[in-house]
Amino acid sequence: MRSHYNTDLGISHVGQSVKLCGWVNSYRDHGGVIFIDLRDRSGIIQLVCDPNDSKEAHEIASNARNEFVLIAEGAIRPRGEGLVNPKLKTGEIEVVVSKLTIENESAVPPFTIADESVNEELRLKYRFLDLRNPKLYENFALRSKACIAARNSLANMGFLEVETPILTKATPEGARDYLVPSRVHQGEFYALPQSPQLFKQLLMCSGFDRYFQIAKCFRDEDLRADRQPEFTQIDVEMSFCEQKDVINVAETFLKDIFKACGKEIQTPFRQMQYKDAMENYGSDKPDLRFDLKFIDVIDIFAKSNNEIFANIAKDTKKNRIKAIRVPKGDTIFSKRQMQRFEEFVRKFGAQGLAFIQVKEDGLKGPLCKFFSEEDLNELSKRCELEVGDVVFFGAGAKKTVLDYMGRFRIFLANELNLIDPNALEFLWVVDFPMFEQNDDGSYSAMHHPFTMPKNIDETDLEEISSIAYDVVLNGVELGGGSIRIHKNDIQQKVFKLLNIDEEQQKEKFGFLLDALSFGAPPHGGIAIGLDRLIMLVTGANSIREVIAFPKTQRAQCLMTDAPSPASNEAMRELGIKLRENIK
């Protein structure tokens, strides 16, 4: 029907006849000549409807309004002197309309498509209108390129695309399952998959060797800016591999994805052990676009005559004292800013925020009186302090200190404008602990219970490490993976350490244990969050901007009003009766 998309046209097309299709973005009547900004998925082009060129087209144009659907035919001409619009890709040209058709009319839209100040809830309610914005379209064009690049890259490396079931069995993977009642087997439920984890392992047991899938996954968890109840991941599994093989494959397809999106990235990515990431940056996904690395000073504080710090420093296993040096910070930060810094860390469990300033005549601050001159010199040397610097200290329980100092590090970087928004800093975090302790004292798998442990015979669960790895970009976890357990006895031992008894093992994972009993090969894999990846590539503020029809932070679709009550008839067929006053 059309000859071109709007932004395919430029000054080189002057004199050509074209046929364009799209929506009225805006409409202006200037002394009898009507100007229409016609919008299609690519962008905007200006139509000129002059009665001297076509009375019929001009008359039809006079009835057009915002969001009417038009088909326009005419000739390209350059805009007049001083009328070029540099904000538009087509800003040097316009279309002199000879024929115009109103293909469909529109009700008055609830908002202007290009208005970025519109409330997000209103945009989501009328998402079909919101998606007419060419800026949003660009996100999905990029997403499509990324998916095509991922498929081509993995296929070139010998991976086979296989779809795994959506209706499956509930298995504990760290979040709540979405359950689907069975009409045929009343009282029983399917679960929507949190990931294809077990099925892709079964494919390795089946000898498929290399699998991938762009998989839809579901998790019933609290939502944040980078989470949705349904999300998409690039899921990969391979047999007869080590960690380095999976990392090489992931770097290859990530490089191809970024190239397709117009960005060049360097491989291999740097690697960092989990314990180093936590001890030096207070995060298992550190943002390395800036420095502000922690400095361990617990041994120096052990020599202070401040009873609080000295007591903290006695237990180097459970406690931490970390410093962050800010070069020239003493010349930058006001007294009010220093107060804000303390208010910030207190929100995350800090008792306060001690600091020392470096003046021309030496170190200054309330802390200094608790140290000998020798200890202050040692502190200055370790922190590499210079005149004008300020150094902040966090002290207390290990988990609390690393958490609030890690958050404070990012807070400082934003305050100091240290973060380059165009930088792409990739990192592999490796050697994760196998288990982590919950608030109630029990243990759970840090990644999942199918990860291969390195030292399974270690008696202290917190000392057992795993062959697990996360890929991080600019402080955001893009995805993670591991080498899997491929031996039945090791898998059962891990289940036992997690207090999953033999009966539960058989009930929940019997099919996996069976598969591991029939010659399962060594295997491992990775999953990359596609939504997060595209969010970072496009610079979007939320994954809602890169998902066509997203849910709100209350897991609702405002456009379709989902979730919604089921009819009584449907509930009877499923054999389900809700409790009264369930809300």
From Swiss-Prot:
Domain of life: Bacteria
GO molecular-function terms, A-Z: aspartate-tRNA ligase activity; aspartate-tRNA(Asn) ligase activity; ATP binding; nucleic acid binding
Site positions (Important for tRNA non-discrimination): H30, G82
Residues that bind L-aspartate: E173, R219, H447, R484
CDD domains named among the record's database cross-references: AspRS_core, EcAspRS_like_N
This enzyme's EC code(s): 6.1.1.23
InterPro entries listed in its UniProt record: Aa-tRNA-synt_II, aa-tRNA-synth_II, aa-tRNA-synth_II/BPL/LPL, Asp-tRNA-ligase_1, Asp-tRNA-ligase_1_N, Asp/Asn-tRNA-synth_IIb, AspRS_core, GAD-like_sf
Keyword NAD: no
Binding site for ATP: R219, D220, E221, Q228, E477, G529, L530, D531, R532
GO biological process: aspartyl-tRNA aminoacylation
Gene3D superfamilies: Bira Bifunctional Protein, Domain 2, GAD-like domain, Nucleic acid-binding proteins
Enzyme class: ligase
Keyword Hydrolase: no
Key words of the record: Aminoacyl-tRNA synthetase, ATP-binding, Cytoplasm, Ligase, Nucleotide-binding, Protein biosynthesis
Localisation per UniProt entry: Cytoplasm
GO cellular component terms, A-Z: cytoplasm
Pfam families on file: GAD, tRNA-synt_2, tRNA_anti-codon
Assembly with partners or alone: Homodimer.
Function (record text): Aspartyl-tRNA synthetase with relaxed tRNA specificity since it is able to aspartylate not only its cognate tRNA(Asp) but also tRNA(Asn). Reaction proceeds in two steps: L-aspartate is first activated by ATP to form Asp-AMP and then transferred to the acceptor end of tRNA(Asp/Asn).
Record-stated family: Belongs to the class-II aminoacyl-tRNA synthetase family. Type 1 subfamily.
HAMAP family on file: Asp_tRNA_synth_type1
Protein name: Aspartate--tRNA(Asp/Asn) ligase
Chain's gene name: aspS
